[in-house]
């Protein structure tokens, strides 16, 4: 009933994504608009010490760049295509998987072929008795892109009945029997990963690292240095359902 409702919603979501208008293509006469969003801000379960932070080189597509590496002991995973580690957050029931394709495998090719089988193979490869020495660069992902229409992608994934009135099942939302989603949009949020933890629109406390490590890092047989383009996944602790996936290319 509020003719300005869409404008208010647009403003609120634009602030969240550090972007301008994101709902320009929506029809103001549509009666139902459903949004799902998250803004994760947390520190690491095992904090870094200042001695764990050092400068190093990263091999980006544009050549070598200087980055800040964070060194820690992390859960180790591996497939015949990639190497990965898992990090845990202290308050939210989430963890972060960082995945680097093997030498000779481009990130684009790996991401294109990244299937549920590869994902579960990584998770199943965990040996709880072993850890790796992981060197992960601090990085950030900009959320300055406008909303992307992902209707066709969702339909092709098998959830096509949601967009067809005679096949959708949303009767509890209305007295009408012909409700269906007209479109689905995705907006990439801003995200930063550093020694303090993970941050979205809020600061994650980038001064949260310890002045001095109280317990020395364990000696490991494996060292994984994420010094070339990689993927990362924010996933649920218990179900391993991915909530956010992205890439860092330098």
Give, region by region, the residue ranges found by the protein language model.
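Non-catalytic, conformational "gating/processing" segments within enzyme and secreted inhibitor domains
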Residues: 1-102, 129-214
């Amino acid at each position: 009933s509020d003719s300005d409702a869409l404008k208010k919603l647009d403003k609120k979501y634009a602030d969240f994504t550090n972007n301008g208008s994101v709902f320009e293509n929506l029809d103001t006469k549509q009666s139902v608009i459903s949004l799902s969003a998250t803004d994760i801000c947390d520190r690491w379960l095992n904090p870094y010490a200042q001695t764990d932070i050092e400068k190093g080189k990263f091999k980006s597509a544009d050549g070598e760049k200087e980055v800040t590496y964070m060194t820690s002991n992390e859960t180790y995973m591996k497939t015949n295509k990639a190497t990965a580690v898992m990090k845990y957050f202290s308050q939210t029931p989430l963890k972060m998987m960082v995945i680097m394709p093997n030498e000779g495998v481009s990130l684009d090719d790996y991401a294109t072929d990244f299937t549920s089988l590869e994902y579960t193979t990584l998770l199943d490869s965990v040996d709880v008795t072993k850890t790796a020495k992981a060197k992960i660069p601090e990085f950030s992902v900009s959320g300055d892109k406008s909303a992307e229409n992902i209707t066709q992608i969702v339909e092709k994934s098998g959830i096509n009945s949601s967009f067809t009135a005679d096949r959708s099942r949303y009767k509890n939302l209305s007295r009408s029997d012909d409700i269906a989603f007209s479109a689905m949009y995705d907006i990439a949020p801003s995200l930063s990963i550093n020694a303090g933890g993970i941050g979205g629109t809020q600061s994650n406390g980038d001064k949260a690292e310890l002045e001095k490590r109280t317990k020395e890092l364990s000696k490991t047989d494996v060292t994984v240095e994420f010094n070339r383009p990689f993927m990362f996944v924010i996933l649920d602790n218990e179900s391993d359902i991915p909530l956010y996936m992205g890439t860092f290319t330098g």
